[in-house]
Amino acid sequence: MNATLRIRNRPVAESTYTSLRGAKAEVVRVEREEREIHPKPPFETGTMLQAATRRLRLSSERVMQLAQDLFEGGLITYHRTDSTRVSEEGKRVARDYIRANFDPEDYNPRTWEPEAEHVEGAHECIRPTRPADAEELRTMVREGAIQTTVTLTSHHLRLYDLVFRRFVASQMKPAKVLYQEAVLEVEVKGVPVAELELSGVLEIVEPGFTKVLTEYDLPAYGIRETPELEEGDRLEIGDVEVLERHEEYPYDQSELVEDMRERGLGRPSTYAQIVEKLFRRGYVYEVPQRRWIFPTTRGEAVYEYLSTHYERFVSEETTRDLEERMDAVALGKAEYQEEMEKLYLELERVVEMPDPEP
């Protein structure tokens, strides 16, 4: 059982660490309630990249290549999409798998219509094309029941597994869990010095969509186990660690893609390309252990030059505006030729600007 005590002052943290070693804790309050947990929508490109880069520890570019292979092999739907919509065919795939492997009552179809205006209507979510999980797919390929355009590697199958489980879960009933929140009062030599909060799931009452997930998937849905506690229980504090954590951390690739998506920068077809280009041009580098991304000296110099001399043209607002104008053309809300003329005039003004001092 682990608990975290957040202290913003280093000296206080260090003195607290010394005090807590060998201390006692008493449970002073326990609250339990049954909660309903709903599945997440199926993957679109952004959420697939976030999950896959983190779970598979692969680059965004590599994940997109694996997805391209799966798509070309007819194993998943189109992987460059910002839609979570599920077609009737998709619902049928989920229904057939759920009825064959779980209780038919677990099937709870949802369309997951996207709310954003710019979402491409023709595309649906990223989903499997047949009611076969990764193990069944491996068997069918090995036995020749399915012919693929590429040799499926373990990475292909692991990505397929992520897509498959996320999709099938999205078409199943919510789960019901017994949730517990407990407050522990920490004592040193009989004197209360701190309070710790422990919360988590005691029991999954009705599994629902969690039947198709693995234990590694559950924390993403807020399902973390916690031991049953009662008021008056007394516990001994075991190992104590002091860890320094910053308020903000550098991006990893999954977080960078997530932030781009939230800010309206890039589209499903360009997320991985943008990240890959930053690496290829030497603007950023990645720390292997943590997979954090940092700017290089070259990247900082290029950013400084462009933001100083062409601030408006390379700003986040201009980028987002251009994306929205392109979406408007795609949706038939704006004329292609008119938007091209506007863009040409904007570019012309930049070209005619006097060269900045070196």
UniProtKB/Swiss-Prot annotation:
GO terms for biological process: DNA topological change. It comes from the Archaea. GO terms for cellular component: cytoplasm. Pfam families: Topoisom_bac. It is found in: Cytoplasm. The active site is at Y78. Its EC number is 5.6.2.-. Residues 1-351 form the Topo IA-type catalytic domain. PROSITE patterns: TOPO_IA_2. Keywords: Cytoplasm, DNA-binding, Isomerase, Topoisomerase. GO terms for molecular function: DNA binding; DNA topoisomerase type II (double strand cut, ATP-hydrolyzing) activity; reverse gyrase activity. Gene3D superfamilies: 2.60.510.20, Topoisomerase I, domain 2 (1.10.460.10), Topoisomerase I, domain 4 (1.10.290.10). Belongs to the type IA topoisomerase family. Starts on a TTG codon. This enzyme is the only unique feature of hyperthermophilic bacteria/archaea known and seems to be essential for adaptation to life at high temperatures. It may play a role in stabilization of DNA at high temperatures. Heterodimer of an RgyrA and RgyrB subunit. The topoisomerase domain is shared between the two subunits. Introduction of positive supercoils requires the cooperation of both the helicase-like and topoisomerase domains of the 2 subunits. The helicase-like domain probably does not directly unwind DNA, but more likely acts by driving ATP-dependent conformational changes within the whole enzyme. Modifies the topological state of DNA by introducing positive supercoils in an ATP-dependent process; dATP also allows positive supercoiling. Increases the linking number in steps of +1. Only this subunit binds DNA, in isolation it does not hydrolyze ATP. Hydrolyzes ATP only in the presence of DNA. Transiently cleaves a single DNA strand and remains covalently bound to the 5' DNA end probably through a tyrosine residue. It changes linking number in steps of one, and nicks DNA preferentially at 5'-CNNN | 3'-sites with a strong preference for 4 pyrimidine residues. This is Reverse gyrase subunit A. It comes from Methanopyrus kandleri (strain AV19 / DSM 6324 / JCM 9639 / NBRC 100938).
